[in-house]
Swiss-Prot record:
InterPro entries xrefs: Cell_div_suppressor_SulA, P-loop_NTPase, SulA_CellDiv_inhibitor, SulA_enterobact
Self-association and partners: Interacts with FtsZ.
Species the sequence originates in: Shigella boydii serotype 4 (strain Sb227)
Record protein name field: Cell division inhibitor SulA
TM spans (from-to): none
Any single GO BP term: DNA repair
Residue ranges of the region described as Lon protease binding: 162-169
Keywords, comma-separated and alphabetical: Cell cycle, Cell division, DNA damage, Septation, SOS response
Site residues, Essential for degradation by Lon protease: H169
One Pfam match: SulA
Region of interest called FtsZ binding, as start-end residue ranges on this chain: 106-112
This protein's record includes keyword Cell cycle: yes
Family: Belongs to the SulA family.
Induction: By DNA damage, as part of the SOS response.
Amino acid sequence: MYTSGYAHRSSSFSSAASKIARVSTENTTAGLISEVVYREDQPMMTQLLLLPLLQQLGQQSRWQLWLTPQQKLSREWVQASGLPLTKVMQISQLSPCHTVESMVRALRTGNYSVVIGWLADDLTEEEHAELVDAANEGNAMGFIMRPVSASSHTTRQLSGLKIHSNLYH
């Protein structure tokens, strides 16, 4: 089979480009905190948005931590969702007053690729800043899940990832 010299040049270029990308990502922080406000009557929409990201993060060697207030994750759901059962940890029955503190501690360790916590109330600016610092320090992602009823809406949102979708409007 014939291969041109161009193919060899492009592969050496892509090798150099990947080396530069790797060095530049090592020098930047990749932590992220995002508040995900979802309607209680449409939980599948949130799953459709977050599952691909969680599946990708599941390929890392780190754990995924779920801090749930009441419900327990079922093994069947975790496996059916394509998440690695051996890398998913859950702490349930966690009091809302301990959720932010637990998230900060977990994010800071660097042992988790993602930490997901449920909160009914808005974060204070201090709590948000503390979570952002912890996520940056641990190079991790944190998601604050906030269910709202279909009739209510939020008045403000702190800076972070905003996902706009026609499915929610």
